[in-house]
A protein has these predicted regions:
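Beta-strand-enriched, solvent-exposed domains that form extended recognition/catalytic surfaces
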Residues: 1-87
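N-terminal active-site segment of His-dependent metallophosphoesterases
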Residues: 18-23, 64-71, 75-162
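A short C-terminal boundary segment appended to hydrolase-like catalytic domains
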Residues: 36, 329-376
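Extended active-site neighborhood of metal-dependent phosphoesterases/phosphodiesterases
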Residues: 70-76, 80-88, 163-238, 266-278, ...
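Active-site-proximal beta-strand elements of phosphoester/diester hydrolases
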Residues: 93-106, 208-217, 245-247, 306-313, ...
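Acidic/histidine-rich helix-loop elements
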Residues: 100-134, 190-196, 218-225, 259-264, ...
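Active-site environment of divalent metal-dependent phosphoester hydrolases
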Residues: 104-108, 159-164, 187-192, 218-221, ...
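His/acidic metal-ligating clusters that form di-metal
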Residues: 139-150, 211, 220-308, 358-376
């Protein structure tokens, strides 16, 4: 840190981002290079630079810890105390990761396409790598370090659905080898209706089966699930001897909602009700996981046995997210991670203020939206 500066004057946007059964991650930025100490319980780590990501491991499940970032006052996003998640019962059987809304080919960020844009609209700096390449490179690096059994990319692989953009996605994510599985999103079916048409399909892992649905209605942003796919899902879930988790690009409509709009931004009401019916009848299904909305959110529908109905924030801008899943004999834990390479954090610090400053709270979600443990 420069002489004459105080840490308390230069720390910004400190967030307790990830809370697991045995680890936490705190992120923040400083004005210029600074050395900052973060304390969790009796552990402390000092980090240096402008963008800081502090990971503390070796914590005990369901235990309260004190948290302190020297020079930062406690806030709603940086509480002075927190409690770690419960650990699912039984042995850990598998680990997998997901990403969504990676948007290869996108060149501007923050545009709604309405007559009156809220702004700001952001671009990569001239001569710099495109921000989708920067963000996805960071995600891939961190996922490779996790060494998961599988990676599911839940759609919006591209910006406009061109062959060149799709190839850029494949070139990047091929680093993950045969562990990588992907399904299209609405952006991928705007030009061609044949890109990434792989679903429905299953991915068999130790202790769990992943079922992937194609929720795209080509040419439009809202989604559907065909009756053929729902019949397939019910058949494979009914026959499964293992718990099952279901993935698609679009999120379901809430069957308890009084507003029934056939152009709902996610899966249309009729198909959402049918999907919830399958979840209700098939007790092997332990959750549904989507992207599309660019936010972290977890809902529970009585019409779907109150299993988690999950949306995960996008890779391409704030907060720059990917999700880790730890599968145990007795359940699973979801941990949403912030992509923390310096280049990625530099971009997401710019984009957190999009849409007239409203984007941070929308995209980030609560701690419970990002990290939770669910029993089978």
């Amino acid at each position: 840190m420069c002489a004459g500066s105080r840490v308390g004057d230069v720390i910004h946007d400190a967030e307790l981002f990830t809370v697991g059964p045995d680890e936490v991650v705190v992120t923040f930025r400083t004005d210029g290079d600074a050395s900052v100490t973060t304390v969790v319980g009796d552990q402390e780590i000092s980090t240096n630079g402008s963008y800081h990501s502090v990971r503390m491991t070796g914590l005990e499940p369901e235990t309260e810890y004190e948290l302190r970032v020297d020079g930062a006052e406690p806030t709603d996003l940086l509480p002075g105390r927190f409690t770690t998640l419960a650990q699912p019962k039984g042995a850990r059987l598998a680990t997998f990761a997901t990403v969504n809304d990676v948007h290869f080919g996108e060149v501007e960020c923050g545009r709604l396409g309405t007559p009156e844009e809220l702004g700001p609209i952001l671009f990569s700096e001239p001569g710099a790598d495109p921000y989708p390449a920067v963000m996805n490179a960071g995600a891939i690096t961190e996922i490779e370090a996790l060494d998961p059994d599988a990676v599911v990319v839940k759609g919006d692989l591209t910006d406009r659905g061109t062959g060149e953009e799709y190839q850029a996605f494949l070139d990047a994510y091929s680093q993950l080898g045969t562990r990588m599985h992907h399904v299209r999103g609405n952006h991928d079916a705007m030009v061609s209706h044949t890109i990434a048409v792989h679903a429905p399909n299953t991915i068999a892992l130790p202790g769990v089966t992943l079922a992937v649905l194609d929720t795209v209605r080509p040419g439009v942003e809202h989604g559907r699930v065909t009756s053929e796919q729902l019949e397939w899902l019910e058949e494979v879930a009914s026959a499964s001897t293992k718990p099952m988790l279901v993935f698609g690009h679009h999120h379901p409509w809430d069957p308890s909602s009084s507003e029934r709009n056939e152009t709902y931004f996610g899966i249309n009401p009729d198909d959402s009700e049918a999907l919830c019916g399958v979840i209700t009848r098939c007790e092997s299904i332990g959750g549904y996981f989507a992207g599309h909305t660019h936010r972290n959110r977890v809902r529970h529908f009585e019409a779907a046995r109150n299993v988690p109905i999950v949306e995960i924030a996008c890779v391409k801008d704030y907060p720059g997210a990917w999700a880790e899943y730890r599968v145990h004999e007795g359940g699973y834990t979801q941990l949403v991670h912030r992509i923390s390479t310096p280049a990625a954090m530099a971009w997401t610090e710019k984009t957190r203020g999009m849409f007239a400053g409203l984007y941070r709270d929308y995209a980030l979600g609560s701690q419970r939206d990002r990290s939770f443990t669910q029993s089978w």
